[in-house]
């Protein structure tokens, strides 16, 4: 296991299975040429015939580090990453996606209606969705799953992958906050420390809706796994 992911470490290379070959190949192509000041990247490694993905497997350089509850530093890393990805065009691999993450994000942004189990978050989702209002923010390529993707080994954090979404950078930061509140033991003041970001209350709301929609659809979710998101939702609601 590496950063919570199934992977095999051999020398300075990590080999791991990927859930989507097309997305993994696109992400590898971006990370291969990306340089982000103040952020170490797990650069991808090609196969002997030049491919990024072979039969559902990909490889990257090993970057040392461990997960730490340094959530402000994770958001700072996110902001640096998204400054570097701001000029990327919308990837075609996102077109027509209907996986759990894509459905949940579309629902959170009011682009799709989902039938969600009330017992695993559907009721809370409906309550929060009533607070959603229009926003003026710009979508770009962002990392949609940064919580658990940033490692620390000294002062310079490391990014282990790139899970692309076409959403505002403020939303990606808000997802980190919601995850940290729900599952990372973050203190109640974390959302307030990033209140200078554009449309912040609504970005937090959409991040909470995203996680609630995902939780309510997840096959392993239950009422017992919901309290963390209930805590996060309560703190987000207080800012609306």
Question: Which positions does each model-derived feature cover?
Answer:
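A conserved alpha-helical element in kinase catalytic cores
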Residues: 16-56, 64-84
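A cross-family kinase active-site recognition segment
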Residues: 68-119, 164-165
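Short, conserved active-site entrance elements at the starts or edges of catalytic domains
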Residues: 111-139
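A structured, mid-to-C-terminal "fold-capping" secondary-structure block
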Residues: 191-217
């Amino acid at each position: 296991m590496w950063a919570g992911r199934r992977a095999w470490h051999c020398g300075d290379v990590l080999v791991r299975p990927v859930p989507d070959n097309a997305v993994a190949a696109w992400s590898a192509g971006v990370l291969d040429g990306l340089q982000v000041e103040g952020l170490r990247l797990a650069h991808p490694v090609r196969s002997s015939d030049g491919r990024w993905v072979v039969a559902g497997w990909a490889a990257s350089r090993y970057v040392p580090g461990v997960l730490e509850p340094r959530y402000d530093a994770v958001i700072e890393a996110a902001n640096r990453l998204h400054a570097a990805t701001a000029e990327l065009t919308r990837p075609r691999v996102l077109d027509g996606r209907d996986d759990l993450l894509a459905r949940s994000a579309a629902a959170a942004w009011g682009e799709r209606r989902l039938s969600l189990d009330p017992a695993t978050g559907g009721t809370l989702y409906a309550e929060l969705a009533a607070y959603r209002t229009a926003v003026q923010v710009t979508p770009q390529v962002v990392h949609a799953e940064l919580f658990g993707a940033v490692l620390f080994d000294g002062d310079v954090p490391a990014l282990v992958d790139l899970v692309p979404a076409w959403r505002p950078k403020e939303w990606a930061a808000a997802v980190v906050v919601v995850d940290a509140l729900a599952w990372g033991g973050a203190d109640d003041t974390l959302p307030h420390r990033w209140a200078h970001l554009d449309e912040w209350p609504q970005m937090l709301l959409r991040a909470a809706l995203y996680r609630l929609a995902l939780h309510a659809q997840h096959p392993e979710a239950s009422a017992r796994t919901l309290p963390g998101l209930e805590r996060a939702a309560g703190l987000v609601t207080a800012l609306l």
